[in-house]
């Protein structure tokens, strides 16, 4: 196991948990703490990436561009990263983000749709950025299939491709198998992004590292979507115990989590019933509220809806299946 590069995504994935209400002061405080603790890359955007601030995804209290500028000014050593989802972020937003200090672009697609990212990788490379591919909902497809999708991203110019456990659905063996498949196929680096819906954020990250992952993600205090992410301070402590600390100040990260992030958190992400259901079913977290609403209307347990959606391997954008599945469950109940 080699010492990995850590990207802290408190100010991006954590935006979901904060309902996109980060302030300039929050960014200054968090970036300063992470930078002093030796974190090399800090991701800053709306939870759904550049241009994510919208009626559909939730409006940001402060614009991405202003937060990115604050981050760049606050960081003495760390590089500033941004997330971009094809179909949401465009060249205009990316160009503006680069002008304000973005140096690393992470381009995220569903794990079945790497082909839609070609233009975005080339655009980022033309702007001189380091590029990272994000294969979201990676648990949905086999290691071999993921490797093929990752190969596309590599061919478009990705410097690293991540296995992304968006739903927190993987077991350690799943994380290891997918990372290993990418390592066996790609020439570029491989990363792993964990969520904690089944309580396995740290365990899955360790399994990914043992399988050869070069880059990993964390959030201070685990602040992120669903049940949260692998906690940056925990990752630092574990890496140090394993003898592969990449230069992180463990105590400083513990203090950052406790004194900088914890006081501003609206709640502590935790594997509660809803979060466990998402991880157990293996569906995207945006399905939850829709399933609850439809379930209440039709008298169907929303967990049954989500589990069936997971069995059918639905991905983001297929929310219309929720009603169909609920109606099928009603018909089955009536026939019983």
Curated annotation (Swiss-Prot):
Name assigned to this protein: 4-hydroxy-2-oxovalerate aldolase
A biological process from GO: L-leucine biosynthetic process
Residues annotated as binding Mn(2+): 13, 193, 195
Residues the UniProt record annotates as site (Transition state stabilizer): 12
Highest taxon, organism lineage: Bacteria
Pfam families, alphabetized: DmpG_comm (PF07836), HMGL-like (PF00682)
Species, as recorded: Roseiflexus castenholzii (strain DSM 13941 / HLO8)
PROSITE patterns: PYR_CT
Entry EC no(s): 4.1.3.39
């Amino acid at each position: 196991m080699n010492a990995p590069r850590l990207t802290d995504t408190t100010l991006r994935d954590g935006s979901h948990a904060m309902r996109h209400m980060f302030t300039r002061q929050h960014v200054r405080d968090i970036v300063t703490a992470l930078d002093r603790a030796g974190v090399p890359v800090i991701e800053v955007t709306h939870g759904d990436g550049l241009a994510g601030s919208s009626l559909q995804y939730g409006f940001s209290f402060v614009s991405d561009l202003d937060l990115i500028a604050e981050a760049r000014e606050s960081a003495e050593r760390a590089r500033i990263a941004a997330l971009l989802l094809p179909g949401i972020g465009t060249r205009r937003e990316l160009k503006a983000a680069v002008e304000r200090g973005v140096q690393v672009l992470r381009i995220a697609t569903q794990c079945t749709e790497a082909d839609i990212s070609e233009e975005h990788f080339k655009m980022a490379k033309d702007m001189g950025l380091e590029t990272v591919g994000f294969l979201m909902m990676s648990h949905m497809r086999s290691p071999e299939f993921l490797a093929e999708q990752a190969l596309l991203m590599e061919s478009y110019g990705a410097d690293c491709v991540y296995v992304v456990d968006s739903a927190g659905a993987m077991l350690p063996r799943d994380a290891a198998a997918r990372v290993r498949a990418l390592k066996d196929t790609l020439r570029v680096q491989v990363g792993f992004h964990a969520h904690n819906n089944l309580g396995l954020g740290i365990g899955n990250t360790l399994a990914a590292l043992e399988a050869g992952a070069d880059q990993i993600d964390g959030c201070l205090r685990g602040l992120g979507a669903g049940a949260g992410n692998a906690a940056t301070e925990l990752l630092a402590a574990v890496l140090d115990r394993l003898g592969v600390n990449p230069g992180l100040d463990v105590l400083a990260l513990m203090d950052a989590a406790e004194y900088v992030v914890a006081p501003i958190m609206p709640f502590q992400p935790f594997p509660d019933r809803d979060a466990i259901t998402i991880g157990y079913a293996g569906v995207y977290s945006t399905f939850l509220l829709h399933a609850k609403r439809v379930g209440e209307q039709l008298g169907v347990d929303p967990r049954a809806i989500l589990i069936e959606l997971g069995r059918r391997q639905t991905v983001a954008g297929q929310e219309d299946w929720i009603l169909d599945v609920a109606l099928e469950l009603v018909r089955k109940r009536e026939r019983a």
